[in-house]
A protein has these predicted regions:
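Structured loop/turn residues at beta-strand edges in well-structured enzyme cores
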Residues: 36, 97, 135
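N-terminal beta1-alpha1 cap of cysteine-dependent amidohydrolase-like domains
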Residues: 1-57, 61-72, 209-213, 217-252
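Short, acidic/turn-prone active-site loops that include or flank metal/cofactor-
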Residues: 31-34, 104, 162
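Short secondary-structure boundary/hinge segments and terminal tails
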Residues: 36-38, 85, 126, 199
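Redox-cofactor binding/interface segments in oxidoreductases and associated redox assembly factors
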Residues: 43, 76, 199
Length: 252
């Protein structure tokens, strides 16, 4: 089956373009009933509060939660990671509704505002083992969240060093006791738990499609028909968008 991409706001076009490079059709999802057409789903980066309001307006949250509960693969990038988290802190007054399912606590905008966005080379040994290529990945962080805590069943795929003071300021938002401060700590920026994948950065804004390939293999592991659908999808795209304009730059 095709891969759904939640197309309420954010970098959904870039995800669809990355899937197309791998010969897989991406389907824009805006309504609950459209989820029945796909076997997996990507929730892209964007403005998480805006995305949540639009999802609530279209009554998508019950269908998204059911999609997760059915064990279908879901990948959240940046704002999508916030959606999948069981708990989010650092939110605006009133917070936002979450899909949940990923046993972690995410700090929204952990790395700061738009002007504090950055790129860095992340160590990704698990990704390299599965997909080949270098053991680093160019992480593009734009008003990015970070994962502060994970449950025992969550596999950490990448982390990033931060000054201990910044981390402890964020942990205080969890009302958790602070440990003795060191010079540097790490926050988690990529995780996997069963059918769920989460990245705090934007793989869709790079020319490296290994995270998309990794997610497609997760999809193939879930259903017997998924692996064959990926191989026969080819480069054909019958969606209404013949050419996809990029809302955000693709970093080479």
């Amino acid at each position: 089956m095709a891969v759904g991409v939640l197309a309420l706001q954010g970098s959904f076009n870039e995800h669809i373009a990355a899937l197309r490079k791998l010969g897989v059709k991406g389907v824009e999802i805006r309504k609950p009933e459209q989820l029945e057409q796909v076997g997996s789903l990507i929730i892209p980066g964007g403005e998480s509060t805006t995305m949540a309001k639009l999802a609530e307006y279209h009554n998508l949250f019950p269908a998204l939660r059911e999609f997760v509960k059915l064990g279908k693969p879901v990948w959240g990038t940046c704002a999508g990671l916030i959606f999948l988290a069981n708990k989010a802190v650092g939110q605006k007054t009133g917070g936002q509704e979450l899909v949940g399912g990923l046993d972690c606590t995410v700090h929204r905008n952990f790395f700061g505002s738009q002007i504090q966005s950055f790129e860095t080379q992340l160590s990704v040994p698990e990704l390299a083992a599965k997909e080949g290529g270098p053991e680093t990945f160019r992480g593009v962080f734009i008003r990015a969240p970070a994962i502060l805590e994970v449950g025992p069943k969550v596999e950490v795929l990448a982390d990033y060093p931060v000054p201990s003071g910044k981390l402890f300021d964020s942990i205080s938002a969890l009302e958790a006791p602070q440990e003795n401060a060191g010079s540097e700590k790490k926050v988690i920026v990529a995780v996997k738990q069963g059918n769920l994948l989460g990245t705090a950065f934007h793989p869709e804004l790079t020319a490296d499609t290994r995270w998309h390939s990794y997610f497609l293999k997760m999809t193939s592991e879930v259903g017997e028909e998924a692996s064959s659908s990926i191989s026969v999808a080819g480069g054909e795209d019958t969606s209404s968008n013949e050419q996809l304009g990029n809302d955000l730059p693709i970093y080479q």
